[in-house]
A protein has these predicted regions:
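A conserved acidic beta->alpha catalytic loop
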Residues: 5-14, 35, 59, 63
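Short alpha-helix within the catalytic core of nucleotide-sugar-dependent glycosyltransferases
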Residues: 13-14, 43, 52, 66-78
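Acidic/His-rich active-site region of diverse nucleotide-sugar glycosyltransferases
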Residues: 91-112, 121
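Hydrophobic/aromatic residue at the end of a short beta strand that borders the catalytic acidic motif
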Residues: 58, 64-69, 91, 147, ...
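Conserved donor NDP-sugar-binding/catalytic core segment of glycosyltransferases
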Residues: 68-101
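Glycine-rich, basic loop-to-helix element that forms the pyrophosphate-binding segment
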Residues: 32-50
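Conserved nucleotide-sugar donor-binding catalytic segment
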Residues: 111-200
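Short aromatic/hydrophobic "clamp" motif used to bind/position activated sugar donors
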Residues: 55
Length: 211
């Protein structure tokens, strides 16, 4: 497990250092730069020499739904022959109790609808997993919103994205969580960013089709 500790000030750094010393399977990375957003932290981890063939998301507040989550994701890569896999998640409170809107599976996004259907939804789902050699060529944008969505659209332009509709991930929300109750201005800014990402991707696909 690679943990990018983006200059934490709440005791996380000290705790991770102790854990990494006790278990070498935990790789504790602290960026040299101070300007990295979530996308930049992804890039730091993916380019690390100990990053394996597949890079799988695990946000700091969230948990995999079972001990077989990673095995299911790797199996999906092998069986579906894809460059990225997106699973299904359950919204919960911090005590793991289900909360609305419940299960998020994006069943409207199917292979039968075609890869362009990803342009019509406002998110790809979770957890997200990548084939590392490709992701190293397509760094995520250094943002803290929509960074994986942007890269997922770029990947789906040329490569298959596999889907898993079984629940793999618990997305936990706690009171005061930055994603739980955003101001309308922030919601609008986030939506504008994704609109721009979709526009850029649509233009790129049109240009590709004209070649």
């Amino acid at each position: 497990m690679i943990v990018v500790d983006n200059h934490s000030s709440d005791g996380t750094t000290e705790l991770l250092a102790q854990m990494a010393e006790a278990d070498t399977r935990l790789v504790h990375l602290i960026p040299e730069r101070n300007d990295l957003c979530i996308g930049g932290c992804w890039n730091l981890a993916v380019h690390h020499e100990l990053c394996g063939e597949f890079a799988v998301q695990l946000d700091s507040d969230d948990v995999y739904s079972g001990p077989d989550t990673l095995a299911k994701i790797v199996a999906a890569f092998r069986e579906q022959k894809c460059a990225m896999v997106v699973g299904t998640y359950q919204m919960t409170d911090f005590q793991m109790n289900p909360i609305p809107p419940g299960v998020i599976d994006h069943k409207e996004w199917t292979e039968g609808n075609g890869r362009n259907n990803a342009l019509r939804i406002n998110g790809l789902g979770a957890p997200r997993a990548f084939w590392t050699p490709l992701l190293r060529k397509l760094d995520l944008p250094n943002t803290s919103y929509g960074e994986v969505y942007a890269r997922g659209l770029r990947i789906s332009r040329e490569y298959r994205i596999g889907r898993i509709y079984d629940g793999l991930y618990c997305c936990r929300r706690w009171e005061g969580n930055s994603d739980a109750a955003l101001e309308i201005e922030k919601v609008n800014a986030n939506n504008l960013y994704k609109d721009r990402v979709r526009t850029w991707e649509l233009e790129a696909r049109i240009a590709l089709n004209r070649k």
